[in-house]
């Protein structure tokens, strides 16, 4: 279903069964009660997982610059009864308007240049999404706003992380997606 839980549903089942540690647990170390800002909401896959991990005492705000995607994600999340708050806006503008250290974690998952085999609905998402890459000035604002860490997700093949001076966390050679952790306020990647 467009805008539906998709791969997040599988990730949530794995978390519930205790079988696998999700990247948001392993790399982001999300914990109950934390405040998360998903700066590139898309279909809200990561926001759904983050909401489960931070629980009812935490909060997740999803920012989406594409109006159609924001509407689809919001409708789907409301149908599910999710506590994720959706806001249609430019994430850079939102971040600039927030006080320093006002959220625990900022998450970026910019649009991948091409589909990964495991991503159903990617072509529709790409047609609706903002294709702009993550900019260094927006990353710097995220570091200012995050109390603990900024997470950046990217396709393994893309030079985006390297272009931002980031290194990805250890991942299996076959993993199509990699994550980088950036210490809040430091401007430096967290050493693996």
Functional labels for PLM-detected ranges:
Residues 1-35, 39, 44, 63-105, 172, ...:
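S-adenosyl-L-methionine
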Residues 43-57:
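Conserved SAM-binding loop of SAM-dependent methyltransferases across substrates and taxa
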Residues 106, 110-138:
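Mobile active-site "lid"/loop adjacent to the S-adenosyl-L-methionine
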Residues 35, 58-59, 83, 148-149:
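Residues at the starts of beta-strands that form the adenosine-phosphate
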Residues 54, 99, 144-146:
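A generic alpha-to-beta junction signature in SAM-dependent methyltransferases
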Residues 135-183:
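Conserved Class I SAM-dependent methyltransferase catalytic core
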């Amino acid at each position: 279903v467009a805008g539906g839980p998709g791969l997040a549903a599988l990730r949530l089942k794995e978390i519930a069964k205790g079988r696998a540690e999700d990247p948001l647990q392993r790399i982001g170390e999300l914990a109950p009660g934390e405040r998360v800002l998903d700066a590139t909401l898309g279909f809200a896959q990561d926001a759904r997982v983050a909401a489960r991990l931070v629980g009812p005492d935490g909060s997740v705000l999803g920012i989406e610059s594409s109006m159609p995607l924001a509407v689809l994600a919001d409708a789907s999340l409301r149908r599910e009864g999710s506590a994720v708050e959706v806001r249609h806006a430019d994430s850079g503008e939102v971040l600039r308007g927030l006080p320093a250290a006002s959220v625990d974690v900022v998450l970026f998952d910019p649009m991948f240049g091409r589909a990964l085999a495991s991503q159903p609905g990617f072509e529709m998402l790409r047609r609706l999404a903002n294709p702009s890459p993550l900019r260094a000035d927006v990353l710097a604002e995220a570091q200012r706003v995050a109390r603990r860490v900024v997470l950046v997700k990217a396709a393994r093949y893309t030079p985006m992380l390297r272009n931002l001076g980031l290194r990805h966390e250890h991942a299996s050679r076959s993993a199509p997606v990699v994550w980088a952790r950036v210490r809040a306020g430091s401007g430096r990647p967290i050493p693996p």
